[in-house]
Regions:
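Non-catalytic cap/lid and distal C-terminal segments of serine-dependent acyl enzymes
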Residues: 1-182
């Protein structure tokens, strides 16, 4: 097919998602530093871990959101608290929920974590896993996707992405390698 996709960050995730959702329709995707494609590493945070928290690591230290040359620029908690001031329509963390979360009262997305404590809602994450975790989708559907998808994903990511997007991308690469994908 002559339909090709590319995108960076959120656009990179969209390119990946479209390619794995419509493998017969699309001829290939070239995502760069896509938003998290494996929720075992969501900006560094394992959303599937028991008692997962987006503000604090298991040792109590803050989860960083952005870095430069190895130095933390901002923590997830500080960034999210600024977003709360803007309201439910503004900000990166809210945008993940608008894309991935089921709809709740009034059509708003169900929050994936408590904005006060940082505690992850495992029921919401189960929905995310079922519907939007790209690596999980490949694991579940590779036998049926292989013929139409193999060799069509051309992922590019560095080793120290500013927003920790490299971790999930490398997990996705490992998933693809484990499946024998080209």
């Amino acid at each position: 097919s002559g339909r090709l996709l590319t995108g960076h960050s959120s656009g990179g995730w969209a390119a990946l998602w479209l390619q794995v959702t419509y493998p017969k329709l699309l001829g290939g995707a070239w995502p760069t530093s896509p938003d998290p494609s494996d929720f075992h590493d969501f900006l560094g945070i394992n959303l599937y871990a028991p008692n997962a928290n987006v503000y604090r690591k298991p040792d109590g230290t803050p989860w960083p959101l952005a870095r430069d040359k190895g130095e933390m620029l901002v923590a997830v908690e500080d960034f999210t608290r600024r977003e709360v001031v803007v309201g439910e329509y503004g900000g990166q963390m809210a945008s993940f929920e608008w894309v991935f979360s089921p709809r709740g009262a009034g059509g708003l997305p169900v929050p994936m974590f408590d904005r006060t404590t940082g505690a992850v809602d495992s029921a919401v994450i189960a929905y995310w896993k079922e519907h939007y975790d790209v690596a999980e989708r490949l694991h579940r559907h590779w036998p049926e996707f292989r013929r139409d998808l193999d060799g069509k994903i051309h992922l590019t990511v560095g080793s120290a992405d500013t927003f920790y997007l490299d971790g999930a991308a490398h997990l996705l690469e490992a998933t693809m390698k484990g499946l024998g994908a080209k």
